[in-house]
């Protein structure tokens, strides 16, 4: 932050910390680690502590964050309470959910219990009204735009590679398969980044969500595959499929979806994951190269594993799988960051 803006931010925070939270000592702002966006977070030494956020309005959609927060909270989805907001400058005062992310708590003994709770949040989210004035639609254009990041940032920029016109044609065909798969399944509220680093484990033992300002109306399997095929932690396929089908049963029991056979649901789920992970290869590359966040490179090998695994399983993505393994994978493993995982 510039010195002037920093002072303005500090003054705003001092002014708007609610009376009930004020400690006798002078308020201090302690910087916290950021996320993949441009927001900066600070813990305030109030009683109890609060989180101050500087979220540049030219980079982040703060209106969306607030309207989605209020909509989710109205359906008992746990997100941070908002105590004050300045839309013009992008300043916010939020409830402090603590420091415990779900990711470090996950192991083979704990995962089923935690994921059951996380999946319950996804079930609650399906009860949220799909209001297009709050949640944009995850339409064909959005899905295709995301997939285009793979070529631009992963293939061209990170691997310094160019595609032949036949490769471009093949990708267009595969993207069509993935987009149709996303649009043909039942739609509901989608967090869009529902994974172990965006779920907080609170002192109350509740799970709460963060980083949901990009939520949309989209495919019913999107958040499920983001959770079960997390880009930062992997589980055996047997467990992933068992949990996915258990979730399908819960959706059907609540009548959020009509009865669908297991094979069709897993195809929705797998190909939705393939769309997400092809996109993520582009996004992680962009975060590293454009936004100076090189740590994301060491998460690429797992995402590549997911891409190869699923594309090999389905006849209509096999051509992509063969091309990726022959053309892209050798260039990827020759990168110096590959051994970091």
Protein language model features and the residues they cover:
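Conserved NTP-binding catalytic cores of kinases and kinase-like/nucleotidyltransferase enzymes
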Residues: 1-91, 188, 202-207, 324-341
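Hydrophobic packing residues in well-ordered alpha-helices of helical domains and bundles
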Residues: 65, 111, 115-118, 143, ...
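Active-site acidic catalytic loop and adjacent metal/ATP-binding pocket
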Residues: 31, 38-44, 52, 125, ...
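ATP/Mg2+ or Mg2+-diphosphate-binding catalytic cores
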Residues: 282-341
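ATP-binding pocket architecture of kinase catalytic cores
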Residues: 33, 37-149, 155-160, 167, ...
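Active-site activation/catalytic loop segments of kinase-like enzymes and analogous catalytic loops
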Residues: 149-158, 220-257, 271-291, 303-311
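An alpha-helical support segment within catalytic cores of ATP-dependent transferases
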Residues: 8-21, 130-136, 142, 146-190, ...
């Amino acid at each position: 932050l510039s010195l002037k803006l920093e002072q303005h931010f500090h003054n705003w925070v001092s002014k708007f910390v609610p009376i009930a939270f004020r400690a006798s000592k002078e308020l201090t702002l302690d910087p916290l680690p950021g996320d993949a966006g441009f927001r900066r977070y600070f813990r305030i030494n109030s009683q109890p502590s609060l989180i101050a956020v500087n979220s540049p309005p030219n980079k982040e959609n703060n209106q969306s964050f607030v309207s989605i927060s209020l909509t989710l909270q109205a359906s008992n989805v746990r997100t941070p309470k908002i105590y004050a907001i300045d839309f013009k400058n992008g300043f916010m005062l939020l409830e402090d959910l603590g420091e415990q992310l779900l990711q470090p708590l996950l192991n083979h003994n704990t995962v089923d219990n935690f994921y059951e709770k996380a999946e319950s949040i996804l079930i609650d989210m399906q009860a949220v009204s799909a209001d297009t004035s709050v949640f944009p639609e995850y339409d064909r254009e959005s899905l295709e735009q995301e997939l285009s990041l793979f070529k631009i940032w992963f293939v061209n920029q990170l691997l310094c590679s160019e595609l032949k016109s036949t490769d471009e044609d093949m990708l267009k065909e595969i993207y069509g398969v993935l987009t149709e798969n996303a649009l043909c399944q039942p739609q509901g509220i989608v967090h869009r980044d529902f994974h172990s680093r965006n779920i907080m484990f609170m002192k109350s033992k509740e799970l709460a969500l963060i980083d949901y300002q990009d939520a949309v109306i989209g495919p019913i399997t999107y958040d499920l595959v983001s959770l079960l095929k997390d880009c930062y932690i992997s589980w055996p396929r047997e467990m992933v499929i068992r949990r996915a089908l258990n979730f399908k049963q819960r959706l059907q029991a609540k009548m959020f979806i009509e009865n669908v056979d297991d094979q069709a649901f897993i195809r929705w789920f797998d190909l939705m994951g393939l769309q997400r992970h092809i996109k993520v290869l582009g996004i992680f590359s962009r975060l590293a190269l454009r936004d100076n966040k090189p740590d994301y490179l060491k998460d690429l090998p797992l995402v590549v594993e997911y891409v190869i695994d699923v594309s090999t399983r389905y006849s209509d993505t096999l051509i992509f799988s063969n091309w990726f393994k022959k053309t892209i994978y050798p260039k990827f493993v020759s990168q110096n960051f590959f051994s970091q995982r």
